[in-house]
Amino acid sequence: MLPDNLEILKEYVERGAKEYDIVLVGAGSAKGRRDHTIEVFESLGEVLFRGVRVKPGRPAMAAVINGKPVICLPGFPMSTAVTLWSLVYPLLRLLTGRAAEQTEMIKDAIGTLESRPAKLLVQHSSPAGIEEWLRVKTARVGDKLYAWALTSGASVLWALAESDAIAMLPPSALECEKETEINLWMTRKVDYDRRALFQGSDDPAIQLLVTPVRRRGADFASRTVGSMGGLAALSRGECHFAAAHLLDESTGGYNDVFIERFANGRKWNRVLVFYRTQGIIVARGNPKGIHNFADLCEKDVVFSNRQPGAGTRVLFDHLLREHGKPADEIKGYSQICTTHMEAANRVYTGLADATLGIKSAADALGLDFIPLTEEPYELVIPEEYMNHPGIVALLDSLHDAEWRAKVEEMGGYRWP
């Protein structure tokens, strides 16, 4: 670990190039005048390149100093990983006389178990002229193997830990439409016969079901797409089960009309998991003095909203109409979050004054909560998937004592 000092960096890099066959400079690239690494490289040797057209990993640079390769690794962990896989590992293979075709060396670097094709579950936009490394999750529904990109930030290691495979998109990829076939470098062995795919309404308690499901020898992968998005995906045959809490304004009931519409005559089974409390989430101490929905409409409040089609968004829009408040008069109405925790976190960090969400999200961040309503949260499962091992394990896990205890600790839930 060295201080950010030009002369000290020069001393150590020069010494390293004399004593070792290859030198790596960690976290040595930055934007602005404090990026000393390029000055060190230029003063001691020949710069080979500064920056690569790869995402993540763009800030990487390399030089030859005293006849030795010196590589600067980017500061963000995912960028560093890609640089190690695509540049450092092949270079080590070359220096040790074990060079091979570049793609094969990279596949070996990331620990590829096998290569296999898959179809994109959702459209993906790739930056022009940039080779993009995607961390993807996968599931098979029917005879189709689907893949979708996880969070792509260079600082996010969660996506790498959660992913099943790496997919490399060429610089020419640009807009990859849904169902585009991509090649996967599998980094995890997945038993697709026992993995179910969930798409639907977000709830932290549902995510906790993964553990008991896996204890029962199965698995499920999930995508948070909102209640409406989940039912739509189910109708297109793009998941094994969904979840919904959609308010029908005409009757005051939940889910019936929407499930009937999307099922279109097919038999879809409904499982009531729990009732949960929805309300207004505000900062601790309630500095804006919000006590009901009318206050939310009348006071100078910055709101954090949910995506169209989410059950919480349907509820919020209904309450706006009920109070005669136009959506365009709500500050932050267009600021979209896709999960309860994301929306609550905007309140926690001061980016918003309030959001509509579940009590457990407020409690998790120590925020204040004004309850408004209680709603049913239902799983929706087509009849043809009821014997799927992932679904069988899921339904059994709903009675898991440990999971139920955790849900009760979270707060804001009531069992049927």
Short names for language-model regions:
Residues 221-232, 328-345:
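Short helix-initiation/N-cap motifs at beta->coil->alpha
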Residues 1-73, 77-82, 105-107, 208, ...:
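Helix-rich terminal scaffold detector
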Residues 243-261, 344-373:
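A ligand-binding cleft/hinge motif common to bilobed small-molecule-binding domains
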